[in-house]
Amino acid sequence: MAKPLTDQEKRRQISIRGIVGVENVAELKKGFNRHLHFTLVKDRNVATPRDYYFALAHTVRDHLVGRWIRTQQHYYDKCPKRVYYLSLEFYMGRTLQNTMINLGLQNACDEAIYQLGLDMEELEEIEEDAGLGNGGLGRLAACFLDSMATLGLAAYGYGIRYEYGIFNQKIREGWQVEEADDWLRHGNPWEKARPEFMLPVHFYGRVEHTQAGTKWVDTQVVLALPYDTPVPGYMNNTVNTMRLWSARAPNDFNLQDFNVGDYIQAVLDRNLAENISRVLYPNDNFFEGKELRLKQEYFVVAATLQDVIRRFKASKFGSKDGVGTVFDAFPDQVAIQLNDTHPALAIPELMRIFVDIEKLPWSKAWEITKKTFAYTNHTVLPEALERWPVDLVEKLLPRHLQIIYEINQKHLDRIVALFPKDIDRMRRMSLIEEEGGKRINMAHLCIVGCHAVNGVAKIHSDIVKTQVFKDFSELEPDKFQNKTNGITPRRWLLLCNPGLADLIAEKIGEDYVKDLSQLTKLHSFVGDDIFLREIAKVKQENKLKFSQFLEKEYKVKINPSSMFDVHVKRIHEYKRQLLNCLHVITMYNRIKKDPKKFFVPRTVIIGGKAAPGYHMAKMIIKLVTSVAEVVNNDPMVGSKLKVIFLENYRVSLAEKVIPATDLSEQISTAGTEASGTGNMKFMLNGALTIGTMDGANVEMAEEAGEENLFIFGMRVDDVAALDKKGYEAKEYYEALPELKLVIDQIDNGFFSPNQPDLFKDIINMLFYHDRFKVFADYEAYVKCQEKVSQLYMNQKAWNTMVLRNIAASGKFSSDRTIREYAKDIWNMEPSDLKISLSKESSNGVNANGK
């Protein structure tokens, strides 16, 4: 059980984690016991640890609701511009500890739970991750919500309340096996259902043209039931809302069709409608054109836009003239950010509402729509770009297809006027692709229908402008921007690495939590040996703690004084976990060749999920686990080298492994990783980076100095040159004896003696269709890794470099990113007002839920 803090520790933490005050603690204990009794209907004799978690969650939630209501009243009174962040993914992780930190309740809660004879850490571990995302894109949305609340922006996250989030990954005999993530099984204390705001969403049907205008009729209706989750800002009394929609069948669903009287079957068929919000599609950077997925995309968009318009009409700006609402002020009151193309149907849907329902002329509707929407691009991989078959859209959303055709016609008219003879340019820029079955290019729809398009790191935004959407940026160069991604320092430092957060606060004060650029002040301590030792001590404590966790959870013993070399992210060929694997085998071979030679001990930790249908990614996991099996059981290797595959990598596991990491692997082929955010988390937590000049690594090197990262391998231009020349994997295989040995071992069954040809698909890919050129960077990577080992032996030099990285990581706060979106795209002003809680929180009748 965690012991209570000493007075000195309390003083040190007072501002960051709140004041412990006797009254606070007494009140929290009272709230806890009240919830145990009245909410959970248990006493201490029969309560389980899960009951205690729920009692604590409800107690903390009590401290949110007044602020939540008060924030919504404040927005209702002041009518600020609102921003709506539309995303099919919100990878939130756990909520309890983050809420305690942002409300300044952590110390008081720790003390209360200790006095109640319970273990806070045990209770925190009971909470399920809200895994409503695959990886970076969904986690970015979660960080952005935290920053928007902390900056006092009137912001709403809108998405889907998936009943099953990203699958739980089990490793059986070295293979990934997926299990359903029934995260709501025990209930979710953080959400509030809002059935009073339930809205209809239409599918199928047909389009009718009448005197009065166009109507979409004979549709199937599914209801969207909103669940609200509070999003607290850091210590500013702002609590914003994430509203997730759940699909419900209407009460008369299918009953009108069953004249025969098969009432039971009609009720059972309600499941078909409700399947829309059943499960998150587990693809990262890959497009799967399934009807259910298209339904999900339209479902979230249709429900959200009705909600946005309802809220606009209820405000003083939604003024009426004789006929209906005047929407001129709409873009001054509403900004909608599309997180990738997944919510792209919002563009034709808003046009449908304006033109068909609100009876606006097309040109007016289009002008308002364009001013309202902005689009963030997240990937340049062609297989990830959404291209929906026209016949599927025609069946599911016939009116939207007509609107998309109309948008495209006007768009192409413009192209033809500007480039009269350039037919190929029209083909390239059309929203409709003709070759191989008609498809709608959703990225093109977004670019045409938005006033701003941004990439997520400088290098990525350049590639977007000069390669992927070159024609569009020639047409409207001012539309294209860069907004380098960021991470929230609340979760990714205060919560996951309290030792480091406190150490920094001792040196520079605690204001850095809301202004991470202040970390540059740490540069003045690079010569302070005592401070460097303290930083190293925090890292060692984190490594020890993680080692104990691994031993308990995975029954693996590792050497906590070895270098922790960590590669955690989705398993994908472009992220090149294979390159890491080849290096592991190379190190193994070197130890075996000369066992007496000194070797810097390493624990290589690789983790991440493979999409269930991605054969190559699953083979990569099997290779890693097979190599681990051989390496970890070779007595000649002993504790010099260990390989761990980290099962079921997720937000709550990232919070454990990142603070314990020495070396962060960011080794995608240059030009393939849009930004990455794991790289930033490692940097902030005192790991050094080995990486290519890709994504945000480029800007990390810019901030810290390239000499303070381990940069290797081809740059974007080198990759292009190699493509032009023709990449011949065999040349590298023949020229590099160590690489040849490694590949031969994999090929001849050294790591799969019972199935010698198990990895033939990997070998075949590496030689004949490796788009990501693993062999081309192998030599540079291995050499760079030798430099890493050398530096690790000089702990003072290593820790100096660590401090330089931490001091340079301030740019990568999502607060900075959101300030840039607010200024350059949304035209909104962050507010540092601490909302007053004085107004009676119970009198907000007309503000409630608005």
From Swiss-Prot:
<keyword id="KW-0808">Transferase</keyword>
<feature type="modified residue" description="N6-acetyllysine">
    <location>
        <position position="470"/>
    </location>
</feature>
<protein>
    <recommendedName>
        <fullName>Glycogen phosphorylase, liver form</fullName>
        <ecNumber>2.4.1.1</ecNumber>
    </recommendedName>
</protein>
<feature type="modified residue" description="N6-succinyllysine">
    <location>
        <position position="364"/>
    </location>
</feature>
<keyword id="KW-0663">Pyridoxal phosphate</keyword>
<feature type="modified residue" description="Phosphoserine; by PHK; in form phosphorylase a">
    <location>
        <position position="15"/>
    </location>
</feature>
<keyword id="KW-0007">Acetylation</keyword>
<dbReference type="Pfam" id="PF00343">
    <property type="entry name" value="Phosphorylase"/>
</dbReference>
<dbReference type="GO" id="GO:0005524">
    <property type="term" value="F:ATP binding"/>
</dbReference>
<dbReference type="GO" id="GO:0030170">
    <property type="term" value="F:pyridoxal phosphate binding"/>
</dbReference>
<feature type="site" description="May be involved in allosteric control">
    <location>
        <position position="156"/>
    </location>
</feature>
<dbReference type="GO" id="GO:0005980">
    <property type="term" value="P:glycogen catabolic process"/>
</dbReference>
<comment type="similarity">
    <text>Belongs to the glycogen phosphorylase family.</text>
</comment>
<keyword id="KW-0547">Nucleotide-binding</keyword>
<feature type="modified residue" description="N-acetylalanine">
    <location>
        <position position="2"/>
    </location>
</feature>
<dbReference type="GO" id="GO:0016208">
    <property type="term" value="F:AMP binding"/>
</dbReference>
<dbReference type="GO" id="GO:0042593">
    <property type="term" value="P:glucose homeostasis"/>
</dbReference>
<dbReference type="GO" id="GO:0002060">
    <property type="term" value="F:purine nucleobase binding"/>
</dbReference>
<feature type="modified residue" description="Phosphoserine">
    <location>
        <position position="561"/>
    </location>
</feature>
<dbReference type="InterPro" id="IPR000811">
    <property type="entry name" value="Glyco_trans_35"/>
</dbReference>
<feature type="site" description="Involved in the association of subunits">
    <location>
        <position position="109"/>
    </location>
</feature>
<feature type="modified residue" description="N6-(pyridoxal phosphate)lysine">
    <location>
        <position position="681"/>
    </location>
</feature>
<keyword id="KW-0597">Phosphoprotein</keyword>
<dbReference type="GO" id="GO:0019842">
    <property type="term" value="F:vitamin binding"/>
</dbReference>
<feature type="modified residue" description="Phosphoserine">
    <location>
        <position position="524"/>
    </location>
</feature>
<dbReference type="GO" id="GO:0005977">
    <property type="term" value="P:glycogen metabolic process"/>
</dbReference>
<dbReference type="GO" id="GO:0008184">
    <property type="term" value="F:glycogen phosphorylase activity"/>
</dbReference>
<comment type="subunit">
    <text>Homodimer; enzymatically active. Interacts with PPP1R3B; recruits the phosphatase PP1 which dephosphorylates and inactivates PYGL/glycogen phosphorylase.</text>
</comment>
<keyword id="KW-0328">Glycosyltransferase</keyword>
<dbReference type="GO" id="GO:0006015">
    <property type="term" value="P:5-phosphoribose 1-diphosphate biosynthetic process"/>
</dbReference>
<feature type="site" description="Involved in the association of subunits">
    <location>
        <position position="143"/>
    </location>
</feature>
<keyword id="KW-0119">Carbohydrate metabolism</keyword>
<dbReference type="InterPro" id="IPR035090">
    <property type="entry name" value="Pyridoxal_P_attach_site"/>
</dbReference>
<dbReference type="GO" id="GO:0005737">
    <property type="term" value="C:cytoplasm"/>
</dbReference>
<dbReference type="GO" id="GO:0005829">
    <property type="term" value="C:cytosol"/>
</dbReference>
<dbReference type="GO" id="GO:0005536">
    <property type="term" value="F:D-glucose binding"/>
</dbReference>
<dbReference type="GO" id="GO:0030246">
    <property type="term" value="F:carbohydrate binding"/>
</dbReference>
<keyword id="KW-0321">Glycogen metabolism</keyword>
<feature type="binding site">
    <location>
        <position position="310"/>
    </location>
    <ligand>
        <name>AMP</name>
    </ligand>
</feature>
<feature type="modified residue" description="N6-acetyllysine">
    <location>
        <position position="796"/>
    </location>
</feature>
<keyword id="KW-0021">Allosteric enzyme</keyword>
<feature type="binding site">
    <location>
        <begin position="43"/>
        <end position="45"/>
    </location>
    <ligand>
        <name>AMP</name>
    </ligand>
</feature>
